[in-house]
Swiss-Prot record:
Family named by the database record: Belongs to the universal ribosomal protein uS17 family.
Protein name, UniProt field: Small ribosomal subunit protein uS17
Pfam families, per database record: Ribosomal_S17 (PF00366)
Record bears the keyword rRNA-binding: yes
Keywords associated with the record: Ribonucleoprotein, Ribosomal protein, RNA-binding, rRNA-binding
Functional note: One of the primary rRNA binding proteins, it binds specifically to the 5'-end of 16S ribosomal RNA.
This protein's GO CC annotations: cytosolic small ribosomal subunit
Assembly and oligomerization: Part of the 30S ribosomal subunit.
Amino acid composition bias (Low complexity), ranges on this chain: 1-23
Length: 126
């Protein structure tokens, strides 16, 4: 009996290691790519970020500086913390002025520091 157990133990590893080459598996299913009948679904691109802020500078050509405000609740103390960030945005027609409330959309890098573009002017400054 002990001899039979040793021979069957030796035979088992050789049977599991003898897999067909090229990643093909019996039944037409590949380990890497899934079943053949499964259609490939293109990955959906994430939506672009939209932000609303106030123009603080319009002195550059076709560029505005917009102050974006972000409010978050402190995880431990619960206080509302207000943080601001200034970003450069592309204004093709140079229509936005200082104090305007504008809507921005994230876009591909347009320059070393410009990654936003003006979508619309929500409210003109008085």
């Amino acid at each position: 009996m002990a001899a039979e157990a040793k021979t069957s133990a030796k035979a088992a590893p050789s049977a599991t290691t003898a897999a067909p080459k090229g990643g093909a598996v019996k039944g037409g299913v590949s380990k890497d790519k899934g079943p053949k009948h499964t259609p490939s679904i293109p990955k959906v691109r994430g939506g672009r970020k939209m932000r609303i802020g106030y123009v603080v500078s319009d002195k550059m050509q076709k560029t505005i500086v917009v102050e974006l405000e972000d409010r978050m609740r402190h995880p431990l103390y619960g206080k509302i913390i207000r943080t601001t960030k200034k970003v450069k945005a592309h204004d093709e027609n140079s229509v936005a002025g200082i104090g305007d409330r504008v809507s921005l959309m994230e876009t591909r890098p347009l320059s070393a520091t410009k990654r936003w573009r003006l979508v619309e002017i929500l409210e003109k400054a008085k």
